[in-house]
Regions:
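The feature captures the beta-strand-to-loop junction immediately N-terminal to the Walker
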Residues: 142-144
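Conserved ABC ATPase "signature" region
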Residues: 212-227
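Conserved beta-strand-loop-alpha-helix hinge in the C-terminal portion
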Residues: 69-91
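Catalytic Walker B motif of ABC-type/P-loop ATPase nucleotide-binding domains
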Residues: 14-17, 256-259
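Conserved ABC ATPase signature
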Residues: 231-235, 239
Length: 289
């Protein structure tokens, strides 16, 4: 819609800041086609992106920015010659999508959804029955834009008042209030969950028996230790995302939910987050992404 509005306004230059960050694969394909059409119409397009695969057939020049400075300029042919290792060394994501082989969900586990339902409209309904999840495991929730992934997380946490659930943990039925008390969430828009005036104070917020040393280690692992006295809202988008993840990891909640946690991140920080989440799952947690 924003791209269409810019085109209708008759502008000759369109600047986009991570336009694919919240899009699924199908929508990204549509975005790529739109950019190609705009380019053919003589419109100059500047795209700031971490996700680069969909731009490979469109881009003419690539500018690599590092710490606020122009590090290198590539022609399209020069950039296409970079292999995966060279891209990753520059903290860039791959030029091609990888296909993942993920095992099917096995039966059994301490966290049981006997029944869950949520009505979007008279015709559309989110419904789950008889699914179990184990402690110490990470579960991926996938689907196209607008299919109910975020709504499902909100239902599991206990944030959706209109939802109906029968959810058990270790044999005991959990009310919405109990699930909310025992859950931690990283939202899609982390600006909605940053409240204090200093990074370290944000980590302390709502945490009983706060472990200061553990918090400092987590910040260091995520490359955020130098911002410990900064205001959270002064961080960049990717830094805020990592910081929200650090905040969740300082809590003791057994149920942890990540809603699009890699949004706005480059390759190296995605690897850091992946390693930290894998380490975190061993601490008697059930993690939903």
């Amino acid at each position: 819609l924003c791209i269409a509005a810019s085109y209708i306004a008759g502008t000759k230059i369109i600047v986009m800041d991570e336009p694919s960050s919240n899009l699924d694969i199908k929508s990204i394909s549509v975005l790529a086609k739109m950019l190609k059409i705009l380019k053919e119409k003589g419109i100059s397009i500047i795209v700031a992106e971490h996700r680069i695969y969909y731009l490979m057939d469109i881009v003419d020049r690539v500018f690599l920015i590092d710490k606020g400075k122009l590090k290198k300029t590539y022609t399209r042919s020069e950039f296409l010659k970079l292999d995966k290792n060279e891209l990753n060394a520059l903290s860039l994501r791959d030029k091609e999508l990888s296909k993942l082989k993920v095992p099917y969900l096995k039966e059994g586990g301490e966290y049981q959804i006997k029944n869950l339902s949520y009505k979007f409209t008279d015709d559309e309904c989110l419904s789950l029955k008889d699914i179990s999840f184990k402690l110490g495991k990470i579960y991926g929730i996938i689907g196209s834009n607008g299919r109910g992934k975020s709504t499902l997380l909100r239902c599991l946490i206990g944030l959706e008042k209109k939802s109906k659930e029968e959810i058990y943990f270790k044999g005991e039925k959990l009310s919405k209030k109990e699930r909310l008390k025992n859950s931690s969430l990283v939202m899609q828009d982390v600006n909605h969950q940053l409240f204090t005036d200093e990074v370290f104070n944000e980590l302390r917020l709502g945490v009983k028996n706060f472990d200061e040393e553990k918090a400092k280690i987590i910040l260091k692992d995520l490359g955020l230790d130098e911002f410990i006295e900064r205001h959270p809202m002064s961080l960049s988008g990717g830094q805020k995302q990592r910081f929200a993840i650090a905040s969740v990891m300082c809590k003791t909640s057994p149920f942890v939910f990540f809603d699009e946690p890699s949004s706005g991140m480059d390759y190296s920080n995605m690897i850091k987050i992946s390693e930290l989440i894998n380490k975190y799952k061993t601490m008697d947690k059930i993690i939903f992404i």
